[in-house]
Amino acid sequence: MVRLYRENRSKFYRVKCPDCENEQIIFEKASTVVDCVVCGHVLAEPRGGRAALKAEILAELE
């Protein structure tokens, strides 16, 4: 079967840091540790496929 268009199977998330309440956009399949740009709190850690999110998800972006 040939795909006529490429489906986007990955998402970005808008998350809120639990410490400083900064909103930040991160990739769902992050391959490195994602820190908050304001306070340095860890927002996501890599887990093979999808990242383990340590922050509140506000919205899914495609």
Curated annotation (Swiss-Prot):
One of its GO terms (molecular function) is structural constituent of ribosome. A zinc finger (C4-type) spans 17-39. The keyword Zinc applies. Binds 1 zinc ion per subunit. It comes from the Archaea. The keyword Plastid does not apply. InterPro entries: Ribosomal_eS27 (IPR000592), Ribosomal_eS27_Zn-bd_dom_sf (IPR023407), Ribosomal_zn-bd (IPR011332). GO terms for cellular component: ribonucleoprotein complex; ribosome. Transmembrane segments: none annotated. One of its GO terms (biological process) is translation. Zn(2+) binds at C17, C20, C36, C39. Pfam families: Ribosomal_S27e (PF01667). Keywords: Metal-binding, Ribonucleoprotein, Ribosomal protein, Zinc, Zinc-finger. Its cofactor is Zn(2+). Belongs to the eukaryotic ribosomal protein eS27 family. Part of the 30S ribosomal subunit. This is Small ribosomal subunit protein eS27. It comes from Methanosphaerula palustris (strain ATCC BAA-1556 / DSM 19958 / E1-9c). The gene is rps27e.
